[in-house]
Amino acid sequence: APIDYGNGASDLNPEDIESVSVLKGPAATALYGSRAANGAIVITTKSGRQTPGLGISFNSSVTFEKAGFWPDFQSEYGAGNGNSSNLDQQRNYNYWSVPAANAEDGIASTGRIYSRVAFGAKFDGQQFYQYESRNWDTDMYRRLPWVYRDWYKGFFDTGVTWNNSIAFSYNNGKGTSARFSVKDSRNDWIVPNTGYDSQNFNMSITSQLNKWLRMTGKVTYYRKNSDNMPMSGYSAASPLYTLIWNPNVVDVSSYYREYAYGRIDRMYEEGTPQLLINSTYADNVYMQVYEQLNTLDRDRVFGNMALNINLAKGLTLDLRTGMDFNNEFRTQRKPWYSNGYPYGYYKEQTVTSLEVNSDFLLSYTRKMGDFDMRA
């Protein structure tokens, strides 16, 4: 299953962004070469103060997230495929065969209509043996009301993101300005046991060295750490995929109790995958988020330096060079008896990239009457 490790744009501190512009066609190609043939998104970060002096700004924010949009599931019929013609099966609709000795009412049930498809018995207030019928202390089973459960909503947490940043901006009044900023972010996402911590350090300096030469430099260091990045997509390793296949009569909290309170050992023999009810490939969703972990440690340094040279009246030369170095250490792990991995799974991956871009631009501007000529 794919893992969302983020992208380069997310490494920027929003407090450092001055402007965002879109260049199309020849304008983009002229400035950024063939890679910008289809256009370019240009993000300009902030520089130092425009007026002499020292400025300090501090920002702190907290953001809360909740899963707010849900599929439109039908809630008239319970789990089942509707194919049984056996009246005893329909009457004793259940997920577990119950011998008379373990039934609180003394009536055995052998009818088991296994299916995650939601076209079983209609929700009419009847009582059946079900997945949650077992009393774990007495090992007895009782019939429970056949009711629809919002089985997917109870899984998600309220996500919280804390952002704190401080920036210092300076201008000496003699042609030199600088800016330095620090940002710290801490996130707990809506999927349990997922989130990240990140820090961003940014510095920029601009100096008019003399009347014909100006120098600009910017550098950013970004660090991100996560003990677990969630999987996504249509795969049995994705919690969101797993939830789709849960029967609509089983509350997701049942899977949490199995995992957190040690009931897995009593429900499954050693060596048997911890699967959802009536599944051959979907793991217990809480085992997925607490033990099938995808860690990330990322360090990234990127920046640029530019010289603007006034060669003559209307004639300027821009020399630019930029560097982007990224190093990531990733791990993926699955415990014993994960579906498809009876002996577990562990993987380490180091992803390193270095990109250096340099260019120059010679431009000439001249005003002729009511017209401007640029080349």
Region annotations inferred by a language model:
Residues 1, 50-147, 175, 189-196, ...:
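Surface-exposed loop/interface segments of Gram-negative outer-membrane beta-barrel transport/assembly proteins
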Residues 2-25:
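Short acidic/polar hinge/loop motifs at secondary-structure boundaries
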Residues 8, 30, 36-60, 164-166:
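N-terminal periplasmic accessory domains that precede
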Residues 14, 161, 173-174, 208-210, ...:
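Outer-membrane beta-barrel channels and translocator barrels
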Residues 45, 160, 166-170, 203-207, ...:
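Residues on the lipid-exposed face of transmembrane beta-strands in outer-membrane beta-barrel proteins
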Residues 155-159:
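Short Gly/Pro-enriched turn/cap motifs at secondary-structure boundaries
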Residues 182-188:
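Transmembrane beta-strand segments that form the barrel wall of outer-membrane beta-barrel proteins
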